[in-house]
Amino acid sequence: MIGAGAAGMTCAATAGQRGRRVLLIEHYHRVGEKIRISGGGRCNFTNTGAGPASYLSQNPDFCRSALARYGPRDFLALVERHGIRWHEKKLGQLFCDETSLHVVRMLRAECDRGGVEWRQPCP
């Protein structure tokens, strides 16, 4: 897998936890850098109001199918399992109470639980 951002780490963790052998490659010296700076350092980690109509796609069935399999509520359940405190800012926008680093650490822990191998920084 290429890229240790939110999507890359989530995908790598899921694949690893399903028994796949995963190598996650990141070119930057820190993983989850965009997560770390999002929301002013508090990480707007999901939006409970986001549905298929919120996304532009050539194939609207893809988004419907993807969100039916793993949506904002699923990610929120993961956040809560890891004990990350959060609050709703407005219209379903969920932010960490403290720091976005909690989400980065959570995703890293999920990857480790799945046995994901890491290569970083990778030129």
Question: What do the PLM-derived regions correspond to, one by one?
Answer:
Residues R21, R85, G115-E117:
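Conserved beta-strand segments of alpha/beta enzyme cores
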Residues G40-K90:
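Glycine-rich active-site loop/strand segments that organize a redox cofactor
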Residues M1-L24:
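N-terminal Rossmann-like FAD-binding beta1-loop-alpha1 element of flavoenzymes
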Residues G8-T10, V31-K34:
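Short N-terminal binding/cap micro-motifs at the start of the first secondary-structure element
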Residues R81-M106:
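Mobile, glycine/GP-rich and aromatic-enriched active-site lid/loop segments adjacent to catalytic centers
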Residues Q120-P123:
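A conserved short coil-to-beta-strand element within the FAD-binding core of flavoproteins
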